[in-house]
Amino acid sequence: MTVLPRIDPMLATPGRLPPLSSDGRYAYEVKQDGQRVIVYLPGDGTVGLRSRSGADITPAYPELGGLGGVLGGRPMVLDGEIVALDDAGRSDFERLQARMGLAGSPAKAARMARTVPAHLMFFDIVFLDGSSLVRAPYTERREALESLGLVGPHWSVPAAITGHGAQALETTRGAGLEGLIAKRLTSRYQPGVRSRSWIKIRLVRTVDVIVGGWVPGHGHLAGLPGALLMGRRDEDGSLRYVGSVGTGWSDTERVTLAGLLDAASVDTCPFTEPPPVTGARWALPRLVGEVRYTTRTRAGRLRHPSWHRLRPDLAPDDTN
């Protein structure tokens, strides 16, 4: 059996569409809203799934076990995203959250697989038949990926188009999708690197933040968070306050957040400079969330932030 190399996923840099003069030098793929995964197929019929952090999440997705038998004895390592699809066929992170974190509960994972099935979207291949492909250009890797015929009940290879980025972005907007990933055709695969060769183009501005505290709610929100206090890591590792967010979550999410914050409660402020907020309570800076916003102030605060989702798949160090 071939010993497969451990690969950290290559990451995209947030940005805008490439200029028209460079449009034809990029392939455009739909940005999926799920859990990044590196897939290990050693060629013996087994499957290994590792998250962006390197954690083994194979038991959480039993319906993907069939992958091990569809490609014969060819050893390979692939890159992709596990998603849960809504009724319109769009990736829905909120649905997927019911499946995440179940690697230690295989019986529950099997039950959830029947009600919230996972789908694995492949978009790259980095090792095949004993040879590393990380130094091969994107075009060669994509050709190798498409040649595998990875179409099944719980996996597929979404389309990629060369050029026509503006039209592709408008199509994703009309379909209610998050945006695009633009990949330079000549780009090599850079494990663990956030590369400018891949550009993440979102239709709304979002940012991952670290929750460092909260302000208790009042009235019917008594005992629940009224607003979360958000931070971002500076280069020296300190936590800088970037604003508070008090909208965007459902009643269920608010209750979930209350429990997480209560478990993370501490007496000391984790921010470099205490926020100018009355009645704040502090939390260990370990919860990561994603918020939407319109722009930033000169001081770096987020304007008009709205809560989008918890990011249990990210650690605080992954937010920069």
Show where each model-derived region lies.
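Catalytic cores of nucleic-acid ligases and guanylyltransferases
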Residues: 1-320
